[in-house]
Amino acid sequence: MFTRNMTIADYDPVLWQAIQDENRRQEEHIELIASENYASPRVMEAQGSQFTNKYAEGYPGKRYYGGCEYADIVEQLAIDRAKELFGADYVNVQPHSGSQANAAVYGALINAGDTILGMDLAHGGHLTHGAKVSFSGKIYNSVLYGITADGLIDYEDVRQKALECKPKLIVAGFSAYSQVVDWAKMREIADEVGAYLFVDMAHVAGLIAAGLYPNPLPHAHVVTTTTHKTLGGPRGGLILSSCGDEEIYKKLQSSVFPANQGGPLVHIIAAKAVCFKEALEPQYKEYQANVIKNAKAMVEVFKQRGYDVVSNGTENHLFLVSFIKQGLTGKAADAALGKANITVNKNAVPNDPQKPFVTSGIRVGTPSVTRRGFNENDVRELAGWMCDVLDALGKENEEQVIAETKEKVLAICKRLPVYPK
């Protein structure tokens, strides 16, 4: 039997301690991983709702279980809000993740063994864009395009590869690209070879929702995104389209359910509905504008301190810092910054001489720090502290600099908490 006053703290103190420790870690560390963000208490409330108990196989108005009348309301709310937010004609809110959303798109549009053309993981793409270790590179014949030495997509290279391999589907989108993708150009290439254009906008969905980054929906046959990252919602996936082809919409529906998934996570869909409502608020655009401003401000500090920034800047929420010139590794930088309570991730950079698990760079993103209230002056100061740590790597004063930086980090985290009381 359950009672509403039951707590994890009373029942499972080991798990409770891990939860408390993670809460403290998030409050006392500066989060700069570009794919992470802080969900609002409202989003987390929805995730912890009684909808976690409900099975709802099927779609609103056409379920395989009874008792879904309120699940229907929740899912339709999420669908309608996502349509309004992105200007989409078709939306599926059921994918459990971005990767599962992508798998559903492949399953709807192409067959096993068909050729896909996507961005190389080592050049800023994603595992599901054709990497050989992913289902997308195992089930399909994947051909990869990359970026130039300047860190920009080489559209002529994309076109030439498309003409050579005649893909059934071209994937546009990224996990580590700091410039604006020309969606219209990618569609032009896709049309030239008779391919579908599939855009994974997971990293920039929040910026697109705010009107600060080009919307791919007018150009792509299908678009996917995660609902966390810049959007700032729960961990989950989303499929959208405005291509006007009802047959594609039907294929997408059946590719999600029953082909790839069974019952949807209604509590997560409820949290998505909250996230979309938050993204429709006027202040959301201001938040996303500050995300970009903060990224640009940090870039300038790194450049002033002698560090190379891939593509020489950023037009979104992230940027890559290359340490090839300094002879440092991303792995060492990641570890040293982590000791100072600054969380980043090591990342491959153009012409990287290091192995993928070592790398010669880091990826830095500003959605999380911006959400906790960091302004341009704060992030300039933060970037300076990061450069102090990087400058000291391998030197006698390394540990001292890390310790001093950690104290500064703790002070600013106390001033700007993630979840103020």
From Swiss-Prot:
Q: State the GO CC annotations.
A: cytosol
Per the record, the major location class is: cytoplasm
Where found, per UniProt? Cytoplasm
Q: Where is the signal peptide?
A: none
**EC number(s) per UniProt?**
2.1.2.1
Q: Name one Pfam family in it.
A: SHMT
The protein's GO terms of the molecular function aspect are:
glycine hydroxymethyltransferase activity; pyridoxal phosphate binding
What does the entry give for GO biological process? glycine biosynthetic process from serine; tetrahydrofolate interconversion
Subunit relationships: Homodimer.
Family as reported in the entry's similarity comment: Belongs to the SHMT family.
Q: What name goes with this protein?
A: Serine hydroxymethyltransferase
Task: Give the species this sequence originates from.
Answer: Haemophilus influenzae (strain PittGG)
